[in-house]
């Protein structure tokens, strides 16, 4: 009787573990979590009312939490109407107890850890040329759902308070929830529900009113945030086959007029077939260097096989025409990506700017440098400006330029500058997101198809699947 209430359908592995001994205990004692021989506990109604309000408010399906059945069963108990519905008290109470316990643990655990596992994003794309290897794009390792605490709290006196405390407290989630309260548009509600799920994962989330840089891929936008101001700019991000990974790091230093050491996969796919073509290498200002000796090799003496041997380095000279532009912003990460200037500023005028091999190109590189170096002295910023071939704005800078007009470009007044303290960086993926300047929720297209993945993974909890 009780076993059929639980069933196996729709139960996650964590839920199965939490309820491993539940049936045996109930069958032997006839004393449940929500009732004993004196009747149903007083807070069963409070917990049910909370779930009936908050589950649909989060865009979730009430049936996935057994709420219609729980509501009917609890009403029968209150009215002592067992005979009129043809069900015995010995059948209904265990069913009510089992469903309400499962709803409690499912909601509390889902809100604390998420209703789906985001690691699925790292099994979307295969490495080019090797279908057995997946490309990692989600650079987090969130904690797996743990029902232990919820299974304990459901038996304690403060169980409603614990349920309430399970809700994510991030400002992004709260903003999305307010928007959900205000909109009746079905498509927007589905989009909001997907983005609310992102807020539940046990990963680093941006904090309100903190000095930080946010890059939101669907918005194709960067915001550099201080407590009292926001610098915004367009970005170009990774193309669909070479997605920009989602990560949390901190910008630690910037490099002015960088040489671009071309990654091996780009050499393989875009450079190697030009081996021996001196015009191509001259036009792109590429050079070939022996990694062991440091010698620059003649283009005509290097074959495609040589370029792919791993013994040579192909790099692009610093200055005008360099693909990284005039400045790069470095931060620790597992993908060798960075934020950088570009030699193609016209790309920022495009509506869709998924163009790169994974790095993020920024529209206002000097302004971003000024944000990062907020405490730098005037000459440091002027040195960066001159090294980027930007017009000087100080008398000292103008005098320096007059004295060095004949010097070779690019100027190298400054090559590296530490960012102290490091500035947190979040590369995010939200298709509904509160604009850091206005607070208004803005909706963006699902450029990488990640929303579709979440929607598919959450069918069991969103009402789009009957298998629970």
Task: Report each predicted region and the residues it spans.
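Sec-dependent bacterial lipoprotein signal peptides
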Residues: 1-3
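Cationic-aromatic interfacial patches
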Residues: 5-128
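Well-ordered beta-sheet/strand-loop patches within structured domains
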Residues: 6-29, 105, 122-125, 151-468
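Short loop/turn hinge sites at secondary-structure boundaries
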Residues: 59, 85, 89, 110, ...
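Extended, domain-scale alpha-helical bundle/helix-rich regions
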Residues: 113, 129-131, 142-144, 155-158
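Eukaryote-specific, cytoplasm-facing alpha-helical/coiled-coil scaffolding segments in long proteins
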Residues: 126-138
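A sensor for short, sequence-defined functional sites
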Residues: 144-146, 173
